[in-house]
Curated annotation (Swiss-Prot):
<dbReference type="GO" id="GO:0000287">
    <property type="term" value="F:magnesium ion binding"/>
</dbReference>
<dbReference type="InterPro" id="IPR047210">
    <property type="entry name" value="TPP_PYR_POXB-like"/>
</dbReference>
<dbReference type="GO" id="GO:0030976">
    <property type="term" value="F:thiamine pyrophosphate binding"/>
</dbReference>
<protein>
    <recommendedName>
        <fullName>Uncharacterized 42.6 kDa protein in isoamylase 3'region</fullName>
    </recommendedName>
</protein>
<dbReference type="InterPro" id="IPR029035">
    <property type="entry name" value="DHS-like_NAD/FAD-binding_dom"/>
</dbReference>
<dbReference type="Pfam" id="PF00205">
    <property type="entry name" value="TPP_enzyme_M"/>
</dbReference>
<dbReference type="InterPro" id="IPR012000">
    <property type="entry name" value="Thiamin_PyroP_enz_cen_dom"/>
</dbReference>
<dbReference type="Pfam" id="PF02776">
    <property type="entry name" value="TPP_enzyme_N"/>
</dbReference>
<dbReference type="InterPro" id="IPR047211">
    <property type="entry name" value="POXB-like"/>
</dbReference>
<dbReference type="InterPro" id="IPR012001">
    <property type="entry name" value="Thiamin_PyroP_enz_TPP-bd_dom"/>
</dbReference>
<dbReference type="InterPro" id="IPR029061">
    <property type="entry name" value="THDP-binding"/>
</dbReference>
């Protein structure tokens, strides 16, 4: 790629990585990037009215596709506006790359117009955050950022001064295969699976608490609940992955949850936490044994005292666990929890609109409508333009 610019290396690398669009607001420090996109024509620039929206849009794309999404902001307040959306992306563990343009490199550290220190500001909401100071540095930093975002599931930030983006570069992007990472599957240790099976086989009433980490594990979860005759409670982050087509689900718990979810956790002998960092300590049972499975070791025991903690992918863990469980026939506890759930839902199922295209804003059923819309993906501009209290009416 002789006689090309650093910005061209950026856009070519993103193209090789499979990026189809970049969300952002144009600015002079981003001119190199946007001009390169214009000349290429194979990556769309999605212009938004505020950089915060760009970060949230990239997060939504990454969440729905599971693939890398990209947003960009110009120097100073431009990229600072990304931060709220990037925190959401990072906490939701979706792969997002943020390109933060910076002031001219010769002016860094001299109190220049709109100068900030983005390498410090974005550190808390990213797995990777680095400043590019030279054309030679760019390829390695950008490739590392992409691998961090995809492999670690979260945000990576690359900071590029506007003048650096316009410099010439002879660098070549990495081959696509080296960046096309798939999320790793963490297999639990065999000894941990044996210990968990022993704990569950020796337990009476078991409840499953499921979170965002149960993505892709719906069918194994249902099989586990059937084997244990256990009710499934879901945290808000697990709602879309757990609740649908699930005869064992007894509702969401938490500050906006059902009493049935709280009841199922409070009255169990053993609580099995699967892929959740459910934050509300007051909702955990005081006397039950608690086991936790999570791919992130730092989550283990962070919210409640554990009798057993293990690192593993939820689906892989259930697959290894099921053959070791004793078959159960007693449904008394499960049926009691399901009855409580039906009682808690009385009157609610009649509230959602009969039509998928009906507005939710005249009904007090926003969570139900929102969950259904996410599954059907039937969004429209007019739908999202309305406020929760109803459509905005402008008097003549």
């Amino acid at each position: 790629m002789a006689n090309t610019k650093v910005a061209d290396v950026v856009t070519e690398t993103l193209h090789v990585a499979g990026v189809k669009r970049i969300y952002g607001v144009v600015g002079d420090s981003l001119n190199g990037i946007t001009d390169s996109l214009r000349r290429r024509g194979d990556i769309d620039w999605i212009h938004v009215r505020h950089e915060e929206s760009a970060a949230f849009a990239a997060g939504a794309e990454a969440h729905l596709t599971g693939e890398l999404a990209v947003c960009a902001g110009s120097c100073g307040p431009g990229n600072l506006h990304l931060i709220n959306g990037l925190f959401d992306c990072h906490r939701s563990r979706v792969p997002v790359l943020a390109i933060a343009a910076h002031i001219p490199s010769a002016e860094i550290g001299r109190g220049y117009f709109q100068e900030t220190h983005p390498e410090s500001l974005f550190r808390e909401c990213s797995h990777y955050c680095e400043l590019v100071s030279s054309p030679e540095q760019l390829p390695g930093v950008l490739e590392s950022a992409i691998r961090a975002a995809v492999g670690l599931r979260g945000v990576a930030v690359v900071i590029i001064p506007g003048d650096v983006a316009l410099r010439e570069s002879n660098a070549k992007p990495a081959a696509g295969a080296s960046m096309a990472l798939r999320p790793p599957v963490v297999q639990p240790a065999a000894a941990d699976v044996d210990a968990l099976a022993q704990l569950l086989n020796d337990s009476g009433k078991v409840t499953l608490l499921c979170g965002r980490g149960c993505a892709g594990a719906h069918d194994p979860l249902v099989k586990l609940a059937e084997a244990l005759k256990a009710p499934i409670v879901h945290a808000f982050g697990g709602k879309e992955y757990v609740e649908y087509d699930n005869p064992y689900d007894v509702g969401m718990t938490g500050l906006i949850g059902f009493s049935s979810g709280y009841h199922a956790m409070l009255n169990c002998d053993t609580l099995l936490m699967l892929g959740t960092d459910f934050p509300y300590r007051q909702f955990y049972p005081a006397d039950a044994k608690i086991a936790q499975v999570d791919v992130r070791p730092e989550n283990l025991g962070r919210r409640a005292r554990l009798d057993l903690g293990m690192v593993g992918d939820v689906s892989a863990t259930i697959g290894a666990l099921l053959p070791k469980l004793k078959a159960r026939t007693d449904r008394a506890y499960l049926d009691a929890c399901l009855a409580h759930y039906r009682k808690a839902r009385e009157g609610l199922d009649e509230l959602p609109p009969a039509s998928r295209d009906a507005s939710p804003f005249t009904h007090n059923t926003w969570p139900s409508w929102s969950a259904r819309q996410r599954r059907t993906m039937r969004f429209s501009r007019s739908t999202w333009a309305r406020r929760r209290s109803g459509p905005r009416v402008i008097s003549p």
